Amino acid sequence: MREKIKLESSAGTGHFYTTTKNKRTMPEKMEIKKFDPVARKHVLYKETKLK
């Protein structure tokens, strides 16, 4: 089953993306480089809980 997650910027800007992931095939926390429009550069986004 796919679960909704939040990817939060490690730049400290407070920007985040929401996405889904399959927890059965990828049980570890996701880390991906994406564009942060507040910092205006690519930064590392880390998975956090979606409240």
Curated annotation (Swiss-Prot):
Note the PROSITE patterns from the entry: RIBOSOMAL_L33
Q: Which UniProt keywords apply?
A: Ribonucleoprotein, Ribosomal protein
Instruction: Report biased composition (Polar residues) as residue ranges.
Output: 10-20
Q: Which SUPFAM superfamilies match?
A: Zn-binding ribosomal proteins (SSF57829)
Alphabetized Gene3D superfamilies for the sequence:
Ribosomal protein L33 (2.20.28.120)
The entry's cellular-component GO terms read: cytosolic large ribosomal subunit
- Annotated stretches, region: Disordered: 1-23
| Pfam families the record matches | Ribosomal_L33
A GO MF term = structural constituent of ribosome
Sorted alphabetically, the Gene Ontology BP terms of this entry are: translation
Record-linked NCBIfam families? PRK00504.1, PRK00595.1, rpmG_bact
Q: Which family does it belong to?
A: Belongs to the bacterial ribosomal protein bL33 family.
Q: What is this protein called?
A: Large ribosomal subunit protein bL33
